[in-house]
């Protein structure tokens, strides 16, 4: 007779066609045409499908785009101050990704009977850049130029935007770029890094963000075109033109140098958002010369001393100032959105130390918590740290080195010390270079030993 298990001898035991478990080992067994699947296999398949869907590039209508107010609100959590720059960036990024929603969807590749992709009959048409068209109006992208002193938050703004929008993001250093054919990095290496950031998913890379830092360091050396070849200055600006505007960049599939017999990945840069940032040290003097009132003759106005600060001058920047600084007009025209960042004052630096989600004081508090101790930084100490950073002219970047220097001895000794409850940084620890206070636990046999470390 047939195999049976159970109370009824005529009952046939059913098994999952995928994992082989019997109907008695699982909660539910669902029947199909001559096959069965259990609830455990269904859960596993659901997880696999969700992971695969998460890896796919988001298509139109998949997710609502955050409004400029929401984008700025997210930036406020990580970046202190710079209200004008945040508002400018929020509008530019919102318009850019709203424009991407109107791009034609990529056509799926046709496969032959062996599963291999069939080449398009019209190769020229297949390589045309995708353009966003709404009611017959073609929408062009607006790349962004960030101008501000060092340590004012240019890079952090770009990083926060990319993290919020969940798009591929890459940072490039303009000082390492040279013209094609010379020792150094070609501008197309930037796109190669973007591809690496998204595991060579071309569709995803074509919607990414590229941040080119130190763009002011590739300015040409004078107002007039040089008679000698400037391969790391004006030459790089010329090479960046088509990449920033939009072109089909040929990128080696797995990096390395190009050679004639190599297959290339074609990446359309038309819909990649380029953000260029630089300190532009000395630009304020160019603006000051342009805005100063001068005259000739007995009734001429004698220009007085301009008391405006760097931040006030940078707000008045015009394309002609950037050209005089050394950027070529063609590149300036391809960076239509200009956002200036203000120089950080003492109050802003104190806020940077304590308020953002990943504030510097919170980071060191977390480090000391791992050793079983607390960290207290008094208000006077915060003010002293901010004043020291302003004196060094390093902006927010100088805050970490000052705080690190103050805590160096404590972090060296703390793992070897026992029963340290709290570390206190006061004004003397910063201004005079004194060591922080160590507060020991009170429930020990020894008395309160609050003293200098």
From Swiss-Prot:
Q: What Pfam families does the record point to?
A: AAA_2, ClpB_D2-small, zf-C4_ClpX
**Which residues does the annotation say bind ATP?**
149-156
Residues that, per the record, bind Zn(2+) = 16, 19, 38, 41
Q: Does the keyword NAD apply?
A: no
Q: Name one GO molecular function term.
A: protein dimerization activity
Source lineage:
Bacteria, Pseudomonadati, Pseudomonadota, Betaproteobacteria, Burkholderiales
Its name, as the record gives it, is ATP-dependent Clp protease ATP-binding subunit ClpX
Q: Which UniProt keywords apply?
A: ATP-binding, Chaperone, Metal-binding, Nucleotide-binding, Zinc
Quaternary context: Component of the ClpX-ClpP complex. Forms a hexameric ring that, in the presence of ATP, binds to fourteen ClpP subunits assembled into a disk-like structure with a central cavity, resembling the structure of eukaryotic proteasomes.
Q: Name one GO cellular component term.
A: HslUV protease complex
Q: Which family does it belong to?
A: Belongs to the ClpX chaperone family.
Q: Which HAMAP family match?
A: ClpX
Quote the function comment for this protein.
ATP-dependent specificity component of the Clp protease. It directs the protease to specific substrates. Can perform chaperone functions in the absence of ClpP.
Q: Which GO terms describe its biological process?
A: cell division; proteolysis involved in protein catabolic process
Which residues are in the ClpX-type ZB domain? 4-57
Q: Which InterPro entries match?
A: AAA+_ATPase, ATP-dep_Clp_protease_ClpX, ATPase_AAA_core, Clp_ATPase_C, Clp_protease_ATP-bd_su_ClpX, ClpX_bact, P-loop_NTPase, Znf_CppX_C4
């Amino acid at each position: 007779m047939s195999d049976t298990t159970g109370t009824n001898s005529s009952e046939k035991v059913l098994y999952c066609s995928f994992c082989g478990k019997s109907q008695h080992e699982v909660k539910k067994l669902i029947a199909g045409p001559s096959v069965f699947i259990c609830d455990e296999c269904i859960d596993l398949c659901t997880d696999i499908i969700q992971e695969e869907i998460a890896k796919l590039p988001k298509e139109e209508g998949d997710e609502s785009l955050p409004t400029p107010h929401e984008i700025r609100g997210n930036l406020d959590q990580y970046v202190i101050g710079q209200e004008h720059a945040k508002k400018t960036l929020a509008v530019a990024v919102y318009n850019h990704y709203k424009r991407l929603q109107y791009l034609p969807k990529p056509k799926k590749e046709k496969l032959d009977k062996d599963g291999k992709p069939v080449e398009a009959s019209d190769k020229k048409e297949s390589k045309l850049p995708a353009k966003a068209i709404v009611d017959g109006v073609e929408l062009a992208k607006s790349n962004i130029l960030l101008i501000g002193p060092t340590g004012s938050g240019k890079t952090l703004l770009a990083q926060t935007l990319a993290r919020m929008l969940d798009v591929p993001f890459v940072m490039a250093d303009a000082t390492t770029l040279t013209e094609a054919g010379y020792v150094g990095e070609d501008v197309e290496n930037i796109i190669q890094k973007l591809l690496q950031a998204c595991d060579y998913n071309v569709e995803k890379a074509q919607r990414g963000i590229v941040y080119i830092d130190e763009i002011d360091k590739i300015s040409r050396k004078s107002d007039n075109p040089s008679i000698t070849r400037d391969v790391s200055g004006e030459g790089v600006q010329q090479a960046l033109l088509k990449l920033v505007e939009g072109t089909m960049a040929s990128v080696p599939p797995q990096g390395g140098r190009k050679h004639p017999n190599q297959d290339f990945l074609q990446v359309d840069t038309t819909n990649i958002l380029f953000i260029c940032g630089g300190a532009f040290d000395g630009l304020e003097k160019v603006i000051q010369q342009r805005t100063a009132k001068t005259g000739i003759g007995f009734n001429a106005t004698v220009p007085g001393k301009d008391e405006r600060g760097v931040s006030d001058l940078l707000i008045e920047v015009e394309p002609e100032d950037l050209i005089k600084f050394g950027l070529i007009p063609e590149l300036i025209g391809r960076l239509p959105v200009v956002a200036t960042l203000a120089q950080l004052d003492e109050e802003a630096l104190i806020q940077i130390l304590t308020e953002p989600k990943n504030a510097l004081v919170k980071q060191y508090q977390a480090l000391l918590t791992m050793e079983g101790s607390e960290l207290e930084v008094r208000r006077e100490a915060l003010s002293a740290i901010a004043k020291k950073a302003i004196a060094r002219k390093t902006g927010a970047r100088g805050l970490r080195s000052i705080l690190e220097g103050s805590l160096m001895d404590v972090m060296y000794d703390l793992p070897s010390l026992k029963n340290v409850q709290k570390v206190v940084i006061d004004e003397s620890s910063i201004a005079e270079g004194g060591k922080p206070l160590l507060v020991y636990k009170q429930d020990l046999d020894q008395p309160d030993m609050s003293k200098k470390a």
